[in-house]
Amino acid sequence: METLFNGTLALAGRDQETTGFAWWAGNARLINLSGKLLGAHVAHAGLIVFWAGAMNLFEVAHFVPEKPMYEQGLILLPHLATLGWGVGPGGEVIDTFPYFVSGVLHLISSAVLGFGGIYHSLLGPETLEESFPFFGYVWKDRNKMTTILGIHLILLGIGAFLLVLKALYFGGVYDTWAPGGGDVRKITNLTLSPSVIFGYLLKSPFGGEGWIVSVDDLEDIIGGHVWLGSICIFGGIWHILTKPFAWARRALVWSGEAYLSYSLAALSIFGFTACCFVWFNNTAYPSEFYGPTGPEASQAQAFTFLVRDQRLGANVGSAQGPTGLGKYLMRSPTGEVIFGGETMRFWDLRAPWLEPLRGPNGLDLSRLKKDIQPWQERRSAEYMTHAPLGSLNSVGGVATEINAVNYVSPRSWLATSHFVLGFFLFVGHLWHAGRARAAAAGFEKGIDRDLEPVLFMTPLN
């Protein structure tokens, strides 16, 4: 692919003339230089880990234990807290030292990776095939490529099992469903039934079903990681030991750019899935740390005013609202008792502060009259005023609310950022897949620049 651009910036002889790529095409110059490409990837990993460590320490330095995490714009500490570090009952932070340790470990790791990146970019061998055949490769070598795929799958499987080990043996993880408002606990009886675990994959993605995003107990999450880790490890071993079948050799494009496009597609799916997970799921992403989900904040508002008006003498079971439906309580299409008013659309919501008040047919009127605990009132009032709404200029909350606080939920940030990144990765997948297929078909030159329409247009002035 020729690129018409200024080729003056040359580094170590890899200029536009020798490689066919200009400086801004970045790693494209390194496609066939496995040693230099290794340097670029290790350096990139160093930058990622450096950001993680530095941002982690930045959040620790700014953290105020008296305020909830989601009010402080934190996106890393909630992940550490969810893993059970530094928190106690109700998600209260009792020790920030583990967070400090995490930041320092990432910074030290990033220094090692940074050194490796600089070494392999500037000093190490340009190609690895001659001196280190195990680490060397040729993009067309299908057997070597699936071996590398297998190694990556095994590493991902080990990662999944690290979470399992943390939950089972190393202090447990934070369970938002623990009685009394959440606590750290060890997961003892994992869900390993394939019908349950793979049942999530077969669910519809729409309301009431919610695909894998609907998972709402830690036993299923950790059990799912056992399955996923096992599949990744056995799949990895299989890919290392076998060569691609004939149908795969024919169907797939076997070039560096093709592998890039496959990876971008996978990351895009991860991004979209993570977006839905952090937006809707309050088990994997506990509301104590990330703030309530949208449906949760809405239901919390209905609950808060039900509590208030019931204290003022309203009969919440029979009060009629302005539309003729129940003001506080009504029935869902399938007959459950649900909160009335605008929040009826979120009747699916399950949340730890609300479930104790449900009976076999939805919300239980006698429990609503006699059993509401102070912690449920406090938590719903807190969630009501912290809906995951907000804008880029950090003016948060409901747009029409006159008593709004300046707050943007980390759920908003994490969901939006992962959606946007997932979208761009998908566009990158289309771009690189198109180029890789064109190159494989033999017409990767692109448009003939001599026939560019703009060359035949009269000047604007």
Swiss-Prot record:
[CaMn4O5] cluster binds at E355. Its main location: plastid. Binds multiple chlorophylls and provides some of the ligands for the Ca-4Mn-5O cluster of the oxygen-evolving complex. It may also provide a ligand for a Cl- that is required for oxygen evolution. PSII binds additional chlorophylls, carotenoids and specific lipids. It is found in: Plastid, Chloroplast thylakoid membrane. Keywords: Acetylation, Chlorophyll, Chloroplast, Chromophore, Manganese, Membrane, Metal-binding, Phosphoprotein, Photosynthesis, Photosystem II, Plastid, Thylakoid, Transmembrane, Transmembrane helix. GO terms for cellular component: chloroplast thylakoid membrane; photosystem II. It is a multi-pass membrane protein. The modification N-acetylthreonine is found at T3. One of its GO terms (biological process) is photosynthetic electron transport in photosystem II. It comes from the Eukaryota. The chain crosses the membrane at residues 57-81, 122-143, 166-188, 243-263, 279-300, 435-459. The keyword Transmembrane helix applies. The modification Phosphothreonine is found at T3. Residues 1-2 form a propeptide. One of its GO terms (molecular function) is metal ion binding. PSII is composed of 1 copy each of membrane proteins PsbA, PsbB, PsbC, PsbD, PsbE, PsbF, PsbH, PsbI, PsbJ, PsbK, PsbL, PsbM, PsbT, PsbX, PsbY, PsbZ, Psb30/Ycf12, at least 3 peripheral proteins of the oxygen-evolving complex and a large number of cofactors. It forms dimeric complexes. Belongs to the PsbB/PsbC family. PsbC subfamily. HAMAP family: PSII_PsbC_CP43 (MF_01496). One of the components of the core complex of photosystem II (PSII). It binds chlorophyll and helps catalyze the primary light-induced photochemical processes of PSII. PSII is a light-driven water:plastoquinone oxidoreductase, using light energy to abstract electrons from H(2)O, generating O(2) and a proton gradient subsequently used for ATP formation. This is Photosystem II CP43 reaction center protein. It comes from Nandina domestica (Heavenly bamboo). The lineage of its organism: Eukaryota, Viridiplantae, Streptophyta, Embryophyta, Tracheophyta.
